[in-house]
Design a protein with these regions (language model features):
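Conserved glycine(s) of the Walker
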Residues: 8
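ATP-dependent small-molecule kinase phosphotransfer cores
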Residues: 27-88
Length: 179
């Protein structure tokens, strides 16, 4: 499960988790915990500021740990916007470890996401414009399709309507029940 920051992943995934037998594992949180143990970062938002090599090493460690788990939904990012450009959130060596069967990409209007980010004092977010958010959502779509080609996993695009996360969650639950 993926989507840009502020799209509502955590809210939707909380509903999905309650309605299924799946546990939710946050890939970024696992990477953060590993990076913090190494004294590389103090907060989660610093992860994307690390060198690309460091991020790749953390991705490998986290994917190895998650790959050993069963019946999990991974809360992650298809593309990570870094100072040097977009970094694949699920490069080949990661998806191989994870054994992905479905990709869900949660989306919303860039204006709505921009407004949500402004209201969230709990995170240190980049000051992206609506256009940059839209670009990031497009890049996420490209990456999702590329990952699907490599894994054979299906891709599902889910719209998170403001104030109605149950609708998005129920679409995901229905797809998971088909598996």
């Amino acid at each position: 499960m993926s989507g840009v920051a502020g799209v509502g992943k955590s809210t939707v995934l909380e509903i999905v988790s309650k309605g299924t037998q799946y546990d939710v594992v946050n890939y970024g949180t696992l990477m953060f915990e590993m990076a913090r143990e190494l004294s590389l970062v103090q907060n989660r938002d610093e992860l994307r500021k690390l060198s690309v090599d460091t991020q790749i090493n953390l991705q490998k460690k986290a994917s190895g740990a998650i790959g050993k788990m069963d019946n999990v939904i991974i809360d992650t990012h298809m593309a990570i916007k870094s100072p040097k450009g977009y970094l694949p959130g699920l490069p080949e060596w990661v998806v191989r470890e994870l054994r992905v069967s479905m990709f869900f990409l949660l989306e919303a209007s860039s204006k709505l996401i921009w407004e949500r980010r402004k209201k969230d004092p709990t995170r240190v977010r980049d000051k992206d414009t609506e256009e940059e958010i839209e670009e990031h959502q497009s890049v996420n779509r490209y990456y999702a399709v590329a990952y699907s080609v490599f894994t054979g996993a299906t891709v599902n695009f889910i719209t998170n309507i403001e104030g109605m996360p149950d609708i998005a969650a129920n679409k995901i639950i229905m797809e998971l029940k088909k598996e």
